[in-house]
UniProtKB/Swiss-Prot annotation:
GO terms for molecular function: sodium channel inhibitor activity; toxin activity. InterPro entries: Delta-hexatoxin. GO terms for cellular component: extracellular region. Belongs to the neurotoxin 06 (delta-actx) family. Its main location: secreted. SUPFAM superfamilies: omega toxin-like. It comes from Illawarra wisharti (Illawarra funnel-web spider). This is Delta-hexatoxin-Iw1a. Inhibits tetrodotoxin-sensitive sodium channels by binding to site 3. It slows the inactivation, causes a prolongation of action potential duration resulting in repetitive firing in autonomic and motor nerve fibers. Does not depolarize the resting potential. Does not affect tetrodotoxin-resistant sodium channels. This lethal neurotoxin is active on both insect and mammalian voltage-gated sodium channels (Nav).
Amino acid sequence: CAKKRNWCGKNEDCCCPMKCIYAWYNQQGSCQSTITGLFKKC
């Protein structure tokens, strides 16, 4: 999993849900699959 400083792209399909949550919290990205990523196997 990438470090939380490496933000997800706005439409990136994330395998690191927490990375997306940090990015969203800091208004640096808005992954569409943040929630589904929690249950996704990469």
